[in-house]
Design a protein with these regions (language model features):
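Short intrinsically disordered, low-complexity coil segments enriched in acidic
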Residues: 1-6, 120, 124, 149, ...
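Beta-strand cores of modular interaction/reader domains in eukaryotic scaffold and signaling proteins
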Residues: 20, 38, 53, 76, ...
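Short, recurring structural edge motifs at helix starts
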Residues: 23-25, 63, 122-129, 135-139, ...
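Short, flexible/disordered secondary-structure transition segments
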Residues: 44-48, 147, 160
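Residue-level signal for mature regions of secreted extracellular proteins and peptides
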Residues: 70, 76-77, 106, 113, ...
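Functionally engaged cysteine thiol sites
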Residues: 84, 111-120, 153, 172
Length: 191
């Protein structure tokens, strides 16, 4: 199956069972089709007790930028010769089960990833990333604006920094209204 046919899954937010990826296709480079996947439930698991099982693929990065929770089951990412970034992810932030482990073996050598520039963006926190760019961070080093990690507020975008808060201006029917929104490194919330 051609990877672009997976785009039908781009609005998927939750898988109650497991995600099993075992495909080697030259143009299958990441799991971007699952970019909105937030939760893998693990109600049913693979025969290896995994809820995320990625084996012998042509992936270079995972691209699961919205994944925030694996309720049950282990993570097994094995024998993906071109895959970088998976070893940099702090899986304990995502996995809720204390009895399941993370098994990452025989993926691309981390030294080769670094030499090839396949490293997390400098705006990502130490939690890791799903792939290249400042939209693939597990969490941001400083600020998150519209799902993009940024080092500071940009006044040209109508964002102004006030301590750890952003002040944004909105123009409504010619009137300017100031809204204060608190940002604590990862949430953009208007009050």
């Amino acid at each position: 199956m051609a990877p672009e046919r997976l785009e039908v899954l781009s609005t998927l937010k939750e898988i109650t069972g497991f995600l099993n990826i075992q495909s080697h296709h030259d143009s299958f480079r990441n799991l971007g089709a699952f970019r909105n996947l937030e939760v893998i439930g693990g109600r049913t698991l693979t025969e290896y007790f995994a809820s995320l099982y990625i084996v012998k693929t042509s992936l270079t990065s995972l691209g699961l930028r919205s994944l925030r929770k694996i309720s049950s089951g282990s993570v097994a990412i094995l024998e993906n010769e071109e895959l970088c970034y998976a070893g940099d992810i702090n899986w304990t932030q995502i996995m809720r089960s204390q009895v399941h482990n993370t098994l990452l073996q025989n993926n691309r050598d981390p030294g080769k990833c670094i030499a090839g520039g396949a490293v997390c963006d400098k705006q990502c926190s130490s939690e890791g990333c799903w792939g290249p760019g400042n939209k693939m961070c597990l969490s941001c080093r400083t600020y998150n604006v519209d799902e993009e990690c940024v080092p500071s507020c940009d006044p040209n975008l109508g964002l102004y920094e006030a301590g750890k808060e952003f002040i944004s201006t909105l123009i409504i029917l010619g009137q300017t209204t100031l809204l204060t929104s608190l940002i604590y490194a990862s949430a953009f919330h208007f009050e």
